[in-house]
C-alpha cells in the first residue's frame, strides 16, 4: 500500500505522538470510558499517543480554512457572511472502532482553545427503514451501498454546507435495528461536523441518464479511514457479538434478543456466518477499496492500538 511513490507519509505511533507538542489532555479516564465503544479498550495513554496529535492536526486545518475564508471575503469585498462548517468524514469496517474515534475527536475538538461547536452524526440514520429493506429483499444487505438513502444524505450535507440553520438528520436505534422515524437530531450551525459511517468515502455509480452526481465525500474538508487486518477485525466483531449477547441482546425489545436465547456455540456460528456473508463481503467489495481516498489512515494492531498513521501529502 505504501510504495515508494505513495501519496502518503507514514509515521509510527511513537513518531506520531511527538506531534502533540504541548497540547494538554483535557479528557479524564472516566470520560474516555464513557466515549469508547463496548469492545474498544482505548485508554488515556492511547489518547495521548494518537488522538491529541490528530486533534491538533485537524485544528490546524480548521484554522487554515478559516483564514482562507477571511481572505476570500476580503477579495470579494463581502462582509458578515458566516463560514460554513468544516466537515470531517470517518470511515472503516464494522467493528474497527470508527465510533470511538469519532466521539473522542469530537470531545477533544470541543475543548480546543477556540471553543468550537462540534457536532457528530452517523450515517446509520440514513439507512432505509427495515420495512423498505424487507420489501426490496435487502435486509441481508444492510450497510451495503444500496441499503442507504443516499439522496437524503446528500440533501442533508448540501443543506449543512449551504449554511442552513436547524437541519434535521434521522436517528437509528441499535436496539430495534431500525431507523427511528419519529426522532431526529438537529444540526444547527456547527463549526465542525463529524460524519461517521462505513459508506462515507464510497463513490456513486453514474445513473442511467449519465448525470453527474456528487459523492458524500465531496462535502468533506478532511477524511479519516480506520484500518486493520481483516482477520483482526473479524476477531473484534465476534468478541463484540459475544459481549452484546450478555448485555444489549438481553433486552426483550432488542432485534437480536433471539441470539441471547441460544447457546454460545449456536450464537457464535450465526455471528461467523453474518461476518462471512455480509460484513466481510461489504468490507472487501465496498469499504476497503475506499481507503486510498482518505486524507489520513489510522492503522490498528492488537487491542485496537494504532500502530502507524498515514497522512496524505499536500
UniProtKB/Swiss-Prot annotation:
Keywords: ATP-binding, Coenzyme A biosynthesis, Cytoplasm, Kinase, Nucleotide-binding, Transferase. Pathway: Cofactor biosynthesis; coenzyme A biosynthesis; CoA from (R)-pantothenate: step 1/5. It comes from Bartonella bacilliformis (strain ATCC 35685 / KC583 / Herrer 020/F12,63). Pfam families: PRK. It is an enzyme of class 2 (transferase). It comes from the Bacteria. Its EC number is 2.7.1.33. The lineage of its organism: Bacteria, Pseudomonadati, Pseudomonadota, Alphaproteobacteria, Hyphomicrobiales. PANTHER family: URIDINE KINASE. Belongs to the prokaryotic pantothenate kinase family. Its main location: cytoplasm. One of its GO terms (cellular component) is cytoplasm. It is found in: Cytoplasm. GO terms for biological process: coenzyme A biosynthetic process. This is Pantothenate kinase. It catalyses: (R)-pantothenate + ATP = (R)-4'-phosphopantothenate + ADP + H(+). ATP binds at residues 92-99.
